[in-house]
UniProtKB/Swiss-Prot annotation:
Localization per record: Cytoplasm
E.C. number: 2.1.1.166
Residues where S-adenosyl-L-methionine binds: G50, W52, D68, D84, D109
Organism: Methanosarcina mazei (strain ATCC BAA-159 / DSM 3647 / Goe1 / Go1 / JCM 11833 / OCM 88)
Keyword Metal-binding assigned: no
Protein name, per record: Ribosomal RNA large subunit methyltransferase E
Keywords: Cytoplasm, Methyltransferase, rRNA processing, S-adenosyl-L-methionine, Transferase
Listed GO CC annotations: cytoplasm
Length: 268
């Protein structure tokens, strides 16, 4: 059955003029998660031979750019860069094409050349996906979307957590067009975070006011953080528990006596 399904998508790709059966994976990802919307600017990393570029252009109708170490044969309405996504020179070329505001969507369907050693192949897949995430963080617009392929294994959950640390909503998804025996899975990140802090960060802050909900409200690098169970005038060590596009939540790890309290105690 798996072989039949694989052959079905292979023949469908040929019939519909796609360069790769992987084109159907992106179609199914988008049907499920709405990663690409009409008019979006899209950057596909590791884009050769171009199957995802064809679908991205159909879905978006806007600016679509493919980047790969290999040359990508021309696709009407699609721009390409031959370069390494880890190189700053490539990042600059991408930004020059998509604009300083960045891309709406970054995709990566790249996979390592398989060696037959699963642990090694899994590690290489995570390395590629990490490079894609680092590139995405440099070229995505605020609230932009991200989709990347990884192989499941020991390092998968750590990578998933890293994506969660940079996007509001994150899902793992296996499209029907993937082989049933394949360990590949796609991670979808929605609404890229551009906050100056991340979940798990720690700060010492003075609570100067309460928000409408009764939580403490502090500014960290101009970003609003709501702190539970505090009073105005308290000095506390907090840990960021959740980050949203425009604000974050934090829990108190330690209550610290203010210098004013210490001085009062000394005078007593």
């Amino acid at each position: 059955m798996a072989r039949d399904r694989r052959d079905y998508y292979y023949h469908q790709a040929k019939e519909e003029g796609y360069r790769s059966r992987a084109s159907f994976k992106l179609k199914q990802i988008n049907e499920k998660h709405n990663v690409i919307k009409r008019g979006d600017s899209v950057v596909d990393l590791g884009a050769a031979p171009g199957g995802w570029l064809q679908v991205a252009k159909q879905l978006s109708g806007g600016k679509v750019l493919g980047v790969d170490l290999q040359r990508i044969d021309p696709i009407e309405g699609v721009e390409t860069i031959q370069g390494d996504i880890n190189a700053e020179s490539t990042i600059k070329k991408i930004i020059k094409i998509v604009g300083e505001k960045g891309a709406d969507v970054v995709l990566c369907d790249a996979a390592p050349n398989l060696s037959g050693n699963w642990s090694y192949d899994h590690a290489r897949s995570i390395e590629l996906a990490t490079s894609a995430l680092e590139c995405a963080k440099k070229i995505l617009k605020p609230k932009g979307n991200f989709a990347v392929k990884v192989f499941q294994g020991d390092m998968f959950n750590d990578y998933l957590d890293e994506v969660r640390n940079n996007f509001v909503r994150v899902k793992a998804y296996s499209p029907q067009a993937s082989r049933s025996q394949s360990a590949e899975i796609y991670i979808i990140g929605k609404k890229f975070l551009t906050a100056p802090l991340r979940k798990g960060d720690k700060f010492v802050v003075d609570i100067e006011k309460l928000g409408s909900s009764g939580d403490g409200a502090v500014l960290i690098e101009g970003f609003v953080v709501f702190v539970k169970e505090v009073e105005v005038g308290e000095k506390v060590r907090i840990k960021i528990s959740d980050v949203k596009p425009n604000f974050a939540f934090a829990d108190v790890e330690e209550r610290i006596e203010s210098s004013e309290t210490e001085n009062r105690e000394k005078s007593d």
